[in-house]
Amino acid sequence: MNLKHHFLIAMPSIKNPLFRRSVVYIYQHSTEGAMGILINKPIHKYTIKNILNKLKINIEKNIDMDKLNHPVLFGGPLSDDRSFILHSPCYSFKSSVNISREITITTSNDIFNTIGTSSQPEKILVALGCSEWGKGQLEQEVIHNAWITTLANLKILFNTPIYDRWYESAKIIGIDIRNISSEIGHS
């Protein structure tokens, strides 16, 4: 099972507040483990503009301010001081890796110089921090019904309102996740 470029959709049985009702985009998965970014947990009152100010990047007058007001997401509990930017492919930044034909991840701050300008990638999602699973850990969590998995969907990743992503991610595979009991078992 390779879950790279997939969503993990938290089952209602997950009680950990970090992952409760979460959707995680898996950007790396191998026999050694997996890494992903939560895509539906905004950081309260924290926007791309806050990051630009923190990095002391000058905001030009002709910048599209709507793009600067996009919320920054809590990507996970690890490296929470580091930016993880999912975006549509474009020219490469200092630290960019293509995940699929449609998605690139960048972890270098040079991408922020393009935000709100004509050089910005067409689609963009900014998160602080990431989530990580050790060798075999994610596979065990899937086997034990902690997650539903599905191929990543660009509409959900970039266009669906943040608070609707959990429900909508399950809906694309025909599941009304609100009707699943939090009590699970094996027969």
Curated annotation (Swiss-Prot):
SUPFAM superfamilies: VC0467-like
InterPro entries xref list: AlgH-like
Taxonomic superkingdom: Bacteria
One cellular component (GO) term of this entry: cytosol
Transmembrane segments: none
Similarity section: Belongs to the UPF0301 (AlgH) family.
PANTHER family assigned: UNCHARACTERIZED PROTEIN YQGE (PTHR30327), UPF0301 PROTEIN YQGE (PTHR30327:SF1)
Protein known as: UPF0301 protein WIGBR1650
Protein source organism: Wigglesworthia glossinidia brevipalpis
